[in-house]
Design a protein with these regions (language model features):
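Catalytic nucleophile serine of serine hydrolases
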Residues: 84-85, 181-184
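The feature captures the short pre-catalytic strand/loop hairpin that immediately precedes
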Residues: 161-173, 234-248, 313
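Active/ligand-binding-proximal structured segments within catalytic/core domains
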Residues: 90
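Second-shell loop/turn segments in exported
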Residues: 22-23, 79-81, 116-120, 149-154, ...
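Catalytic loop of the DD-peptidase/beta-lactamase superfamily, centered on the K-T-G motif
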Residues: 21-62, 195-200, 204-208, 212, ...
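Active-site helix/loop module of the DD-peptidase/beta-lactamase fold
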Residues: 30, 70, 81-85, 97-144, ...
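N-terminal leader/targeting segments and the immediately adjacent pre-domain N-terminus
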Residues: 1-80, 96-104, 111, 129-140, ...
């Protein structure tokens, strides 16, 4: 299938970024120019909205369209699928339920499932609610043998019974808590068991515990007719409209839709600009639970995991953030506690893996890190069958992402965990590039000419990935 899951959306590359000399927050004009470049020049989106909040207030900058040929303007009330940013809401539910005494972080997940479901364990260690929130459960990104009836809406037919059957028969590859590995299944399962504990469904729980308390009227799984009229149409990397995603069973992993204004309201509460009874739960949610989840080279950002949030620390400062993606959308939400600035970036296009999807815009506004460079010109060559086969395999790009290089009908493809499959074009026997993105891959060829590792080059960054056994 073309899309396994855009719900996995952590940045692929985390090598050392460069910072601009001017650390002033960009003006509306400067932000609009960035969006115009992404839409008009790079053709990486159809319509984007950026929201910024700080002590001076909030502002919305938009560019592009709801759909190709749709004259209606984008604004702060335009609806987008926010994908994995939903996991932040799910983990806030967890923190709030801990505050209320309804659950504990160390509770085994099995406590909140039917007796007929056999949760996997290993060496006497059970998966806990904390393990699910911090992606150290040992559960895979999503169910192995995940075969949707409709690849364009891949989670629509994934049922609770299928999830229960998978869990009951799954063997953990490692002890729970041992290693960070991003898991949509884990995020969705967390939302499921919290809703079971509360005696309701996930959407109702989010509305009762979070959105109604914060006045977020435009954040929901199921859109009202009025909200649906404001929904930006999602697009694929070729800027063609795609279906919206329905995620009934794994709703806690990525089912929410929202707007820039609503997400800025959420960040206002995180930053202390909006009084809320969720204050203590939000503070608890940002406590780092595991440091340096993606070890990298000198000067590279440190990535830590909190409850649902990713905490990025580098020379530009600390940013608490998450991003998201579904079949036709890419999103970013984050805040800088030191400067008390929050940023939301929403795009109604899911570009090819490797293309700038909006994260760099968010970090640029929050810390002054430089924006991604536009794709460069390449020259294609033809490789013989043996040369292509030597490059195929699975490479450990980062703990939460494997890059699979496959050969199908004589053509090479790459697919990072949770991303679209994309064609790889050769410009030398050991160097491939993505057509629609500023990303290249260099392979190290071992004995016999078989690739032993690769390096992904993107936005001036180089990240090595060894071949997996």
């Amino acid at each position: 299938m073309k899309i396994t899951s855009g719900l996995v959306a952590l940045s692929l590359l985390v090598a050392a970024p460069a910072w601009s000399q001017n650390r002033t927050t960009p003006s509306d004009t400067q932000i609009r120019a960035i969006l115009a470049d992404r839409i008009d020049t790079r053709k990486q989106s159809v319509g984007m909205v950026v929201g910024v909040i700080d002590a001076k207030g909030r502002r919305i900058v938009s560019y592009g369209a709801l759909n190709q040929g749709d004259p209606r303007p984008l604004d702060g009330d335009t609806e987008y699928e926010i994908g994995s940013i939903t996991k932040v809401f799910t983990s806030l539910l967890l923190a709030d339920m801990v505050e209320r005494g309804e659950v504990s972080l160390g509770d085994p997940v099995s406590k909140y499932l039917p007796p007929s479901v056999k949760m996997p364990s290993r060496n006497g260690k059970e998966i806990t609610l904390l393990d699910l929130s911090t992606h150290v459960s040992g559960l895979p990104v999503e169910q192995e043998s995940f075969k949707p009836a409709d690849p364009a809406n891949p989670f629509a037919d994934y049922t609770v019974d299928r999830m229960y059957a998978f869990l009951s028969g799954y063997t953990l590859p490692r002890d729970p808590g041992e290693k960070f590995e991003y898991s949509n299944l884990g995020g969705g399962l967390l939302g499921h068991v919290l809703a079971r504990r509360a005696g309701t469904d996930y959407e109702t729980l989010v509305r009762r515990r979070i959105t109604s308390r914060l006045g977020m009227k435009d954040t929901a799984v199921t859109l009202t007719p009025a909200m649906a009229k404001r929904l930006a149409v999602g697009h694929d990397a070729g800027l063609k409209p795609v279906k919206n995603w329905d995620i009934p069973t794994l709703a806690g992993a990525g089912a929410l839709r929202s707007t820039a204004n609503d997400l800025l309201t959420f960040l206002a509460a995180e930053l202390g600009f909006k009084a809320t009874a969720l204050k203590d739960a939000m503070a608890e949610q940002t406590v780092v639970r595991r440091a340096n989840i993606m070890p990298s080279g000198p000067g590279a950002p440190e990535l830590d995991i909190a409850l649902g949030w990713i905490v990025r620390k580098d020379a530009g400062g600390t940013v608490i953030w998450h991003n998201g993606g579904t079949g036709g959308y890419r999103t970013f939400a984050g805040f800088n506690p030191a400067t008390r600035t929050g940023v939301v970036v929403l795009s109604n296009t899911n570009p090819d893996a490797g293309a700038a999807a909006g994260d760099d815009i968010g970090f640029h506004i929050l810390t002054g890190s430089k924006l991604s460079e536009p794709p460069q010109a390449h020259h294609e060559i033809v490789l013989d069958q043996a040369a292509k086969e030597a490059l195929t395999g699975r490479y450990q790009l980062r703990p939460d992402s494997i890059l699979a290089v496959t050969l199908e009908d004589g053509k090479l493809f790459g697919q990072a965990t949770g991303q679209e499959k994309f064609p790889l074009i050769a410009e030398s026997p050991n160097r491939l590039y993505l057509k629609a993105a500023d990303a290249e891959i260099t392979f190290t060829l071992g004995p016999g000419g078989r690739a032993s590792s690769l390096v992904v080059h993107q936005n001036g960054r180089d990240v090595p990935a060894p071949r997996m056994p």
